[in-house]
């Protein structure tokens, strides 16, 4: 029993011991397996390190090999350079030897020429005396002269030995034969000696490259030879710097030819240097400014052939090209090869596509985008080809400005475009409206289009603060305030004044000076705009007592310009007949017309952008509505007479109808109440009524006669024979001037006769000179009133010859358009006005 109990008690101990042994074995296995894994990892790491070391060693060996190869190449290049230098030295030595030989031969020729000069000029006593004083040993016999001729022939052959080795024997034989013949004939006939000697002298002169007469050469042999020696020495120095081939070929050439060849070699080397520099930029396609190097005749993307360059700008350049697919001329804007310009051009393409899609009928004066592509890392924008810009138009008027009638046409079209851009569907701010960005569609028409949307943006995507050209920059941009569509309206106001006056309205040299120019005309901006401006302290000083602002002095200007106020009415010339009275007594430039123009400009140039006039309000302004005052005096008088006659006829008809009605009513009353109607008109007898009607008719006839007499007097004043003759003379002069100008846009007679499509035409008479000294003819043909308007101008020119001579071609007659009041976008363009 005890043993069983003990065995029972020992059983758990035995189990524990067995479990411990098992766990120990397991721990040992885990330990050894971990050791084995660590060993394997260590071995793998060691292998990886060894591989890395091997790779590094291989790379180092490869680098060493490359360095050795570079060293070998450098050594080879040095050896080649040394060999080239040795060859050059040898060539220079050969050249020097050849030049020394040439000089010796040339000196021999000089002596021989001096000997021959006495023979050739026996009849010229003056020449012989000159040679006797300079060379006393030159007086020899005929036989000795014949010997000298033989020497000359030999010397000439020696000169030819340098370049023509194969022809030596032939030349020597011919020359020796000639000399033998001369020796046989010399003693008999001296005249033959003279001829032969002249031939020899001509040969010598050919070697020296003198093409003058024989006598003059003989008179100045010594001086010319000395000069030739000096020139040869100079040529030697030049030839040492040039190639060997040129030196060998230039031994028998003129000094001028040697210099020309040397110059060409140097220029070619400089061109090579330039090509090496240019090859650094976009594989040689671009210049240092990242602009594409345009080559005339080059074809872009197998479609557009470059015709000519139209201009350059900060964005890149514009070229004229021919589209081989559409068979038309186009303009290509080649953007610079820089990322900022590329990204901005993408925005311009997106905006043009948006506006063109919203305007499929091309009514709203925005340039048409035709295509765009990338060519040699340059983004290219293809648009329709237009004509001159408004600045070119202004320059061709010699900066005298254009008439209000033409400004009315331009302003109406630009406002049409601005209204279209301000619609919610388009929502585009141009941000750079100026005369250079407004182009004529045709040089003979007043239709325009707006271009260059490279700075444009949506009203809710304003990216830049520094926008607009300085002369046309709005005050909110100068003061760094928030801006909207109204900045384009400010620019338009500045443009319209400049187009009429001929000079920029606000021409500041910097931002502070620009603000000064604006304040001179429009006074200080509102205080709330200055208060909210981050540049207030830069431009203004605030009075702490009165809380008023004053403009700071401009210290950056080189010249001290005193602050002086100007009136906008004086700049435009409202009361003086235009700027410098250039438009005085012209049709369409009356005081009322100028007052309307001034009112429109003042509303465009209001400081507060919220109070500034909108495009739709501007289109409804009275400046664009036709009035009697805006028409020529003759048309006014004719219209007045027509209106008066119409009124009189209406009055007559009304009186007759009233009399009939009264007679009918009076008869009724008289039948009913014959006693009580004594005071009524019906109480009068029919005879009295007829007398009254006759008197009224007589009065009307007298008034009509007076009006006709007044019209005849006006016609006699305007259509006098002298004015008609002067008018025809003026037309003849214009036609003669057009015959002289052979440019395609200078046919004035066509403009005077062409009145089918456009009653208001702009004509730029452009020459091909760089200065573009052209005349601009703004011709208006109004069917039956062409000569009426011309006669008015002739009368004005006769009264003001000194003032209006410069404007005979610039200020012709123009009629203002008749745009209606436009409430909607669809009704924006006039339906019955095709003259724009």
Swiss-Prot record:
Cellular component GO terms held in the UniProt record: nucleus
UniProt catalytic activity: L-seryl-[protein] + ATP = O-phospho-L-seryl-[protein] + ADP + H(+); L-threonyl-[protein] + ATP = O-phospho-L-threonyl-[protein] + ADP + H(+); L-tyrosyl-[protein] + ATP = O-phospho-L-tyrosyl-[protein] + ADP + H(+)
Pfam families named in the record: Pkinase
Coiled coil feature spans: none
SMART domains cross-referenced by the UniProt entry: S_TKc
One GO MF term attached to the UniProt entry: ATP binding
Start-end of Basic and acidic residues biased regions: 729-744
Record: active site: 432
Compositionally biased region (Polar residues): 718-728
Gene Ontology biological process terms from the UniProt entry: positive regulation of DNA-templated transcription
Sequence positions that bind ATP: 310-318, 333
EC number: 2.7.12.1
Region (Disordered): 99-286, 627-697, 718-767, 785-836
Class in the EC hierarchy, top level: transferase
Ranges for domain Protein kinase: 304-624
Composition-biased stretches (Low complexity): 99-278, 630-697, 785-816
PROSITE patterns given in the database record: PROTEIN_KINASE_ATP (PS00107), PROTEIN_KINASE_DOM (PS50011), PROTEIN_KINASE_ST (PS00108)
Keywords recorded for this protein, A-Z: ATP-binding, Kinase, Nucleotide-binding, Serine/threonine-protein kinase, Transferase
Family affiliation: Belongs to the protein kinase superfamily. CMGC Ser/Thr protein kinase family. MNB/DYRK subfamily.
PANTHER family the record matches: DUAL SPECIFICITY PROTEIN KINASE, SERINE_THREONINE-PROTEIN KINASE MINIBRAIN
Protein name as annotated: Probable serine/threonine-protein kinase dyrk1
Native source species: Dictyostelium discoideum (Social amoeba)
